Amino acid sequence: MSQTSSTNFKYVIVNKDTNITDLEDIISSNSLEITKNSLIPDDKRELYYSFMNELTNIDLNPDIEPNPILRFLFSNSKLHNSYQKFEEAYKKLCKKYKTFPKKSQIYYLYRQELYKNNIPKNIQLEKQLITKHIRSQSGVLVISVIMPPDNFSCSYNCYYCPNDPKYSRSYFKGEPTVQRGEQNNFDAYKQFYSRAITYFINGHPIDKVEIIILGGTFSCYSPSISENFIRDLFYASNTIFDSHITMRERKSLFEEIEINEHAICKIIGITVETRPDKITKYELRRFRSYGVTRIQMGVQHTDDLILEKVNRQCTQVQIKKGIKLAKDNGFKIDIHIMPDLPDASPEIDHKMFQTIINDPDYQADQWKIYPTNVLEFTEIKKWYDEGSYVPYAETNFNEFINLLIWVMKSIPPWIRINRIQRDFPGNYIEGGNKITNLRQVLDNKIAEQCIQCKDIRSMEVKLNDENGHKARIVRIDYDASDGKEIFLSHKSCNCFFCWKYFIYQIMSFLLDLFFGITLYFYGCGNEDTIYSFLRLRISSENYENCFAESFRNKGKIRELHVYGKMNSTYESNGSGVQHHGFGRSLLSCAEKIAFENNCDGTCVIAGVGTRNYYRKFGYEINYDEKNHGTFMIKNF
């Protein structure tokens, strides 16, 4: 690689002979190397240097070569602390020099120098330069990839589900993940790499990644296809910071998994899509051997007649059994719900949502609400065209909206609503609800009514961590699938002075001092922000165990999550909520509760990249008969 200055780039992503003026172009390039020439074109180099020199005025460390880019990065601190001042200075210089360097370009260079320890970390500057904060404000970076189109992407024919032969079942070209998949020939390595590098360039840490695998029904793909696909995801994660000039060969899936435990870019969770009736002992064992931690499954509806109408071929009994088996064996559960299906009405769907909210057998961790859309390549489009199916979202839109508002107000605090409305472009929707930003519309209407929703997503701390010091552990118990779920979370309330918590502290101190009894706080009712949470399951005695017998009498920690600005695992004292002991305290509390419920230990469905975290607290990896790691276990 030719060098034009003393700055040597470690990460290689575009052709060294090509000048790229827009970093988005880098991602679609099929070449591998990047040089300073490709990041900053020759004809703009002097302009950019003059731009940066004038914007900054700072004496650098004399041991570091004076560099106009570094001068720009460490300019006046007042500029960094004020978004308005930063933008004003930026715009003035853009006008003067008739050029506009992207923030992502500047931030990319900043991170290069930071990784080489040439410059100190500047958190305020990062806040000004990072784009799309929302991508990592939930504590992890989510990368969605899609399986290749295949004759067996789904062997079922649900009448609402599009079957475009060019793509995996239920997906269309216009969806963002599908577009990225097609650009990368549905290759797992390329999809992961291009998405991760895009995030990295835009300023997000990429050392904690959660993978969502989309595309039909995962269980319908042949094991060889699915295993190789996941192997390539781990390979991409393990080698993302390697020199592409000397790339190593792919190893087996299980070798790549072991490498990922100690990689810079760790996969901390994998989500797959399947059907409730596909949840079996064999399938759950296979999922764990792949590193899968979360299962998305389509419930769609609770009325068997409606499910039969749309040829779902899956009954309520099968749905409940699948949910129970997965939860009893430690998995996180996301469910998909479809109001406005053929033969449904607002009254029927209201009853459906009531059932899913209140019935212990339907309790899930996350929801995706997908109002039925009439699309090409579906059977229901024929019914729609002939007039035998008329979605009530068209005939009674206000009732449709009011139903969803009621749902959002009624969601229990242990559930997260991930999405409302599929990501279909508006021009693909031929009938039913055509509002593509439906969640935003609902959020606005709820805000107008001054209502605070209690679901997890509505209460996430995001980047506003100013009340983190007020967070306390709140416990919620609820029945679920013939077992008990304990939802522990760090929350803060909007009370001026929380009398309930004050009284709890006094009672807790006295009971512990005189009787050795632990008292738990169940909330004051005014909690408005969540910082972290943990899901602990205590299964019934005779539940169906899919794994080793040592797994049976354990409290299952199905999820541990800390929200807020995502900090790198290499930051020992990052800003925001992460790395401040929230996870440790929840883990300790869960172990105490499991002990009180006569468990002989706890086990965690730990993502591959989180195993070392749990080892710090006495957890050890449990191996199956094929010597594949499954759960992290701690015996009391």
Model-assigned labels for residue ranges:
Residues 2-178, 182-191, 195-245, 413:
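Flexible, acidic/Gly-rich N-terminal and inter-domain linker regions that tether
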Residues 173-191, 211-235, 240-402, 577-580:
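Conserved non-cysteine loop/helix-boundary elements of the Radical SAM core domain that shape
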Residues 224-232, 345-364, 424-443, 614-625:
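Short, electropositive alpha-helical surface patch
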Residues 371-416, 422-467, 569, 573-577:
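Radical SAM enzyme [4Fe-4S]-AdoMet core and its adjacent flexible, acidic
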Residues 479-494, 516, 525-565:
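A conserved beta-strand-loop-helix scaffold within acyl/acetyltransferase catalytic domains
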Residues 573-593:
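Conserved acetyl-CoA-binding loop-helix of GNAT-fold acetyltransferases
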Residues 593-606:
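Conserved GNAT acetyl-CoA-binding A-motif
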Residues 606-634:
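Conserved active-site alpha-helix within GNAT-family acetyltransferase domains
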